[in-house]
Amino acid sequence: MNLILMGLPGAGKGTQAEKIIDTYGIPHISTGDMFRAAMKNETALGLEAKSYIDKGELVPDEVTNGIVKERLAEPDTDKGFLLDGFPRTLDQAKALDTMLKELNKKIDAVIDIHVEEDVLIERLAGRFICRTCGATYHKLFNPPKVEGTCDRCGGHEFYQREDDKPETVKNRLAVNIESSAPILAFYKEQGLMHTIDGNREIDTVFSDVKKIIDEN
């Protein structure tokens, strides 16, 4: 079973990925892990990627695609894999199709965990931090026991990181929505696309994920 897992930040993709791996025993192939392994092992492509990352530049598609292909050629992917964080662009999706054909493999299903934008903003923009000790809270999922008082140090001053502010979160989501739309359309055209409502209990969402995997 060869899967691609998609979903916007805050949709619970990481949690579902863990459950898929635990249940089906297939390798979790995430872009971050692939880059780290390629750089640690000092492969030619890993060193090339490192040269861009060290300069704070985006790694070009041909380098990323090469690292992905090297990983998908490893024997542990022969019985299936879960791709997470790739493809990020339509060009990468097309390149993935080509490399899988060369490896005599194919994608069986693309699962998109869909959560409404306002819910994602609520989830992502709810984090705040104690200015005194750095303890992290979330207004919905992990508020202080006493409102306005830090559980750890008793401080009363809190702040939000720039990344967690609603406007920043909104902009980040807009960029993600725009870049993922052509990829979703590409896989829909191939009849591989499955969209799941992610605004439910984790196990309920996974029950739907499992159904899709078992039917493929």
Curated annotation (Swiss-Prot):
InterPro entries per record: Adenyl_kin_sub (IPR006259), Adenylat/UMP-CMP_kin (IPR000850), Adenylat_kinase_CS (IPR033690), Adenylate_kinase_lid-dom (IPR007862), P-loop_NTPase (IPR027417)
Protein residues bound to AMP: 31, 36, 57-59, 85-88, 92, 161, 172
Pathway in which the depicted protein is active: Purine metabolism; AMP biosynthesis via salvage pathway; AMP from ADP: step 1/1
Catalytic activity: AMP + ATP = 2 ADP
Binding locations of Zn(2+): 130, 133, 150, 153
Family that this chain belongs to: Belongs to the adenylate kinase family.
UniProt-recorded name of the protein: Adenylate kinase
Species: Enterococcus faecalis (strain ATCC 700802 / V583)
Gene that produces this protein: adk
